[in-house]
A protein has these predicted regions:
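Regulatory and interdomain segments flanking nucleotide-handling catalytic cores
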Residues: 1-632
Length: 632
């Protein structure tokens, strides 16, 4: 576009998107919120093109469309409009989006109810006049920032309803207004209008929008192994049949939650029971699911009814039978070299660093190039195409790792991944980034499938923000939250520093962390949790201890000596699960060599994850131990 092209530049931004998406109770809520945002952005694009003759810049023409666009279109829309029509078109788009949202609300409730503060739509329109595209872009960004600083505290009048359980900034819908189409088991939930639209989105949109649950994603590697060994290991079909029979006995069979098929599971074997394992069987393969008191409460509407059910001999027999089948199946799989089902999965939040500076031509891509906005809007159109290609590659990378994508826009991504392959997915998404775009940072949070999804999402985004605070950004924030509430986190640069010891040239913290994932390295090796306390007990002598310690009180060992001591401690807490080679002398020698090799790699990896001039980072050690125990 020439500097004197007679058109207007408009920028439309949907704000509050991350908040609306993360205020989700289930994975289906999460997916629906993402699709609602994507549909709003898509509506803006369609309206601009059809009603205002717009030339799209973000997303550029030809990059949207198909299934992937439903959750991959960016929440930023940029277009060129005939001169003098920019402000009119921007206002019309805002009105159109508000009307579309109102229509979705009416489809759920049968009437138009207010949703103060959602959706939030910011507009900026700039007439070119004698301005260049670069000048118009800069002015539009300033105008947009100024509009965002003007807070609109739109609130309804005084109402007495309870606060929404997901979004306490809103009041919940009263019982009389709960959508009639809501399933019976949802009608007791205190949800605001906007969250009822989210909850029922899959039932009102075209197609089946159900989404795998957290326990389905966490158990995917184990269920895949069960299905793979189905026809080759005697006992597997019979034990899964017993699991199925127990789970399909009343009142357990009346579970109203319909589980969708988890992507990544083999199509064979066929039949009713394998089909059940691919869908509703995900929660029942965990022995801990089969708890009499918990299931009695789940299957009844009151505590009094639960007290009666948990003393019912028939109910107790059913639960005990299911627990035995799950435990025997786990023991059989372990004997075949398959780890027990992990109760954990991970949230992966990925975001390109300094995207605003890059789009303004002030920041560099990974290839050290900058955008030249003097060439006009084509520079941004090329970026849009790069983002679309990146989103496609990242989606494939997550799916290859057994994960499911919530949204992927090229500059950001949110996904749920099994614990076993979470680090693999994080690295693959990074490698899928276009070299012309800036580096990206990541937040990776491991959590128990029965824990709060909303807390996990918020924690993953907090880790992402912390990763962006390190020097140069380009970081990985990783942490975990156990079902007990215990947690740890650390932030590491993607490109590591050189260490003094013998290095295997591990340049990324993922390389160091991945050593602790059993399926990635030394699957027989185990680390005792007591390693942490021993390392902390010797920390002052190994590296001087934490910064708060009085340095003069301790004699700090020379680096090579400290490293040997550290390796000795690691070796002391390393054990191997039984192998298939028996107990002869040759096997014993092999085991000793494997333990030595594992201890050497663990020592090197822990040092690489420690701050400069230190050998130990307490939280990094905690995460390493967690991965070795739970990322299976």
């Amino acid at each position: 576009m020439s500097d004197h092209d007679p058109r207007d530049l408009i920028v439309i931004a949907l704000s509050g998107v991350q908040r609306y998406i993360t205020e989700s109770q289930t994975t289906a809520d999460l997916r629906a919120a993402s699709q609602i945002v994507a549909h709003l952005a898509s509506e803006a694009v369609d309206h601009l093109k059809k009603d205002h003759g717009a030339e799209m810049v973000f997303p550029s023409t030809g990059v949207q469309g198909g299934e992937e666009a439903k959750d991959g279109i960016p929440n930023r829309v940029v277009a060129l409009i005939p001169a003098g029509q920019g402000a009119i078109a921007a206002t019309a788009v805002k009105k159109h989006l508000k009307a579309r949202w109102k229509g979705w609300v009416e489809a759920v409730f049968g009437e138009g109810l207010e949703t103060p503060g959602w959706p939030v739509i910011y507009l900026a329109s700039v007439s070119f006049g004698s301005r260049s595209y670069a000048e118009a872009w800069e002015l539009a960004q300033r105008s947009l920032a100024e509009r965002k600083n003007i807070r609109d505290f739109s609130q309804p009048g005084h109402v007495s309803e309870e606060l929404c359980m997901l979004s306490p900034r809103w009041r919940a819908v009263n019982k009389e207004n709960v959508p009639s189409r809501a399933p019976e088991h949802w009608k007791g939930e205190q949800l605001a209008v906007a969250n009822w639209v989210k909850r029922l989105w899959g039932r009102d949109a075209d197609g089946d929008q159900r989404f795998p649950s957290t326990n389905a994603i966490a158990s995917l590697p184990y269920r895949r192994a069960v299905l793979t060994l189905w026809e080759n290991v005697p006992g597997v079909p019979e034990l899964v049949q017993r699991l199925h029979d127990a789970a399909m006995t009343e009142p357990l069979a009346s579970d109203p939650i319909k589980e969708t098929r988890t992507p990544g599971l083999p199509e064979q074997p066929s039949g009713k029971v394998p089909r059940w394992l691919r869908r509703r069987g995900s929660r029942w393969i965990y022995p801990e699911t089969w708890h009499v008191d918990a299931l009695a409460r789940e299957c009844t509407d009151s505590l009094d009814e639960a007290d009666v059910l948990k003393t019912d001999p028939s109910f107790i027999r059913t639960v005990r039978s299911g627990e035995r089948a799950a435990r025997e199946l786990m023991e059989l799989m372990v004997a075949e070299g398959v780890a027990p089902p992990s109760p954990h999965l991970a949230v992966l939040a990925h975001d390109v660093d300094s995207m605003g500076k890059y789009l303004s031509g002030e920041g560099e891509g990974q290839d050290r190039t900058r955008l030249d906005l003097s060439r006009g809007h084509e520079e941004h159109s090329k970026v849009s195409a790069r983002l679309a290609r990146t989103a496609t590659l990242q989606r494939a990378a997550v799916e290859d790792a057994g994960g499911v994508v919530i949204y992927a826009g090229g500059d950001d991504l949110l996904a749920l991944v099994p614990a076993e392959s979470a680090l693999e997915a994080a690295r693959a998404c990074r490698e899928a980034g276009d070299p012309g775009l800036p580096h990206a940072s990541d937040g990776l949070l491991f959590f128990h499938h029965g824990s709060s999804l909303q807390r996990a999402l918020n924690s993953a985004h907090e880790l992402l923000e912390e990763a962006k605070e390190i020097d140069g950004k380009n970081g990985l924030g990783v942490g975990y939250i156990r079902s007990s509430g215990s947690n740890a986190k650390c932030v590491l640069p993607w490109v590591g520093r050189e260490t003094q010891g013998p290095s295997s040239v591990q340049s990324s913290p993922v390389d160091s962390l991945e050593l602790f994932v059993p399926s990635a390295s030394h699957p027989r090796a185990r680390l005792s949790p007591r390693l942490l306390s021993d390392l902390l007990a010797q920390r002052n002598h190994l590296d001087g201890g934490p910064e708060s310690a009085t340095q003069d009180q301790y004699e700090v060992l020379r680096y090579d000596v400290a490293r040997r001591v550290m390796k000795k401690l690691v070796l002391r807490h390393t054990s191997l699960t039984p192998g298939s080679g028996g107990t002869n002398e040759h096997s014993a020698q092999n085991d000793k060599a494997e333990k030595e090799a594992f201890a050497e790699q663990v020592t090197e990896s822990l040092i690489r994850m420690a701050p400069k001039q230190k050998l130990i980072d307490e939280n990094a050690v905690r995460i390493a131990l967690f991965l070795r125990q739970e990322a299976r």
